[in-house]
Amino acid sequence: MIEMKPNGESNFYTFNRFYERFKNSDNRYDTWELIERYMQQLKEWYHSFDLFHHIGFLVATGTSVKSLLDIAMSTDHPIKKSDFKLRVLDMIREKMAFKVGDNDFGEDIDYAELNYEDHSEFIQYVLLLFNIETIRQKGDENVRFPFYRYKNEGTWSLEHIHAQNSESLKTNQEWKEWLEVHKKSLEGLEVSSDDKKQIEEVIDKMNTIITHINEKGYKGSIRDEFNAVAPAVINILSDGDDKSQMHTLSNMALLTVGENAALNNSTFDVKRMKIIAMDKAGEYIPVCTRNVFMKYYSSSDTKLHFWSEEDRKGYISAMNNVLYDYKEKNSNKEIKLIRNRINYGNRK
């Protein structure tokens, strides 16, 4: 860890590096003292609830532990513990000031202009910090952000909260899975009698396609049949959705749905049912992702089965409350971890 362990190296890499240094050292006492100082500093960070989360974010997004140790333990430029904490906050703000092009002279990107196709890494930074700070700001010393899950489990990906794209599905199995999960969602909707008739007609078409997929030797085009019904399904399960916001922060979450293409390309209600199933099974769900699908950030009068414009605005408002408007409970001091407020829609 301290010596920038390369990928694929043994878990004992750090020990082995120090052991080699120990063997070749003329003054083993100094080497051992250095090890103890490193260990003491790391333990101090770990036991500091705030530094655990703030340093954890920096390391999770590419800052080396060694560089942080160099700052905290420098003898040439000694730094007070209080000043080190402020320096860490500055490093987070610097990391959250996104630019395109040259690192020093590139163009600033407004948070509202971040989109999944061009800035997925930046969006992941925002959502990761949002999840970390949501936990840290609650102040429960017994509940910490699980960095070991984020690093080791490899299942956290950037996902659309509500997807409208079924074009990436290519196989009969993917089409069948998509039809089955969305049919279940349609069957659970509470609608008027007129809408119910329309939904039943769409479900009949979905059942026909599923039958054709299961039918050996079927000569028709499953692709054409699927492409004909999918837009109607998506339209029913969308609520006045603004397609211009499809790839923006307001429609993205850290989600652990894995490699299931049919689910990844599903609408909000289908993913919501999956999140509920995962929760019942005791699987870990990032806190802000769980809040999104449980409508924690939404007003009480929003429709449970849809991800609407009001829901997206509530989601962005929650990000601002945590990342821009947060005040320390004891001092009421503002801590802004992003350079300005996140707007919904275009830059204002």
Feature locations, PLM:
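Flexible coil/loop and intrinsically disordered segments
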Residues: 1-348
